Every structure is written in structure tokens, then in C-alpha cells.
Amino acid sequence: MEDRNQHFAVTLKAIRKAKKWSLDRASQATGVSKAMLGQIERGESSPTLATLWKIAEGFETALSTFIEPKPADNQDARVRTATELRRKPVSDDMLMASMFTYDERFGFEMIELTLMPGYERIADPHEQGTTEHVIVVKGDMELLLNGEWLPMPEGSALRFAADCIHGYRNLNDQPAVFHNLIHHAKISPDR
């Protein structure tokens, strides 16, 4: 947990400084309190997934930027396993593995998400033009789109504009696992 908090802290501070934003300005852009942003930057607080999404959206950067460091090398071919990457964000009943962090050459990030039984998350709209590609690889889940929960059985896939309120839930007694490829229309170049 210490390493993760340190990564959150260093990344948040670096992005904020690159934008030349004060904590007040960052708070306005993200909807996260100045106090909470300061605690994260000092490594004193572990943000929830919902908070990380708000921060990523406010800074116009990819969520995966905060999950793990960008690879130092520029390898196009490398094997990654979800098992070694999977993490549980603090106070969220969801597991997350950043399969591919955001790369500006491709314009997307790919995340594996595991929803525990009974988990539900409503996501705020992403930046204009963002598209999500959800592929259910294990179990059944539901996806909220246009105010309606759509059943997503194992093996199903859905692409949708994610610049609106949407959500994910698992009403079953077994975990549901899905891959989410998020294509960003634009990402701030000074991320």
C-alpha cells in the first residue's frame, strides 16, 4: 500500500505542477476537495477508485496513469498477466488490473475489472468523445446506459460513448470480470 500511495502522490503532484495549477485550481477541476488532494500528494491518503476517476477526468488524463507507472522502455510487445497486476483500490469492492497504461500513440488504456457480488458503481461522464469497449470474460453483470441497466452475460461485448453517466453492477453471487478498453478522444499533452 505504501508504494501505491507514493505513486499516487508523485503522479498527482507532477501532473498538477506541469499544468501550473494550485491545489485550489485542481480542486475546482476535479471536484475533489483541496484537503483531500493535499493528503494524496503527501502520501497520507489512499483515494478510492471514484476519487481517482474524478482526478483523472479533471486533469484530462487516463486513469491508468494513477494506477501504475508508465513503462520506462518503449516495448511494443510484452506479456502481462492480470493476476500479477490485479489490485484492490481502497474501500472499493472491485479489483483492477491495468493491462495497458495509456499510451498517446494509440489513444487508449485497457483495464481488467472484477466486480465482487453485490458491487455497483455509477460513473460520471468522461471527457467528450471518450468511448468504452466492455467485454465480459467471466460471470454476468449489468451495464447502466441511458438510464437503463442492460444485462451483460459472459462473452458479451458493448461499445458506447462514455461521455454520459454510466455504471456497472454485479447482482450475482459470483465475481464478474470484464475488460474495459477506454479510447480517449483527447488527453492533455502535459500529463
Features from the language model and the residues they span:
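A short glycine-rich, His/Asp/Glu-containing loop-to-beta-strand
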Residues: 85-124, 180-185
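Short acidic-glycine-tyrosine-enriched beta hairpin
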Residues: 147-161
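A short, Lys/Arg-rich alpha-helix, primarily the initiator
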Residues: 1-18
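Double-stranded beta-helix
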Residues: 171, 176-191
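Short, charged recognition helix plus adjacent turn
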Residues: 68-95
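DNA major-groove recognition helix of helix-turn-helix/homeodomain DNA-binding modules
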Residues: 50-65
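Short, conserved beta-strand element in jelly-roll/cupin
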Residues: 112-116, 127-143
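Short alpha-helical DNA-recognition segment
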Residues: 20-38
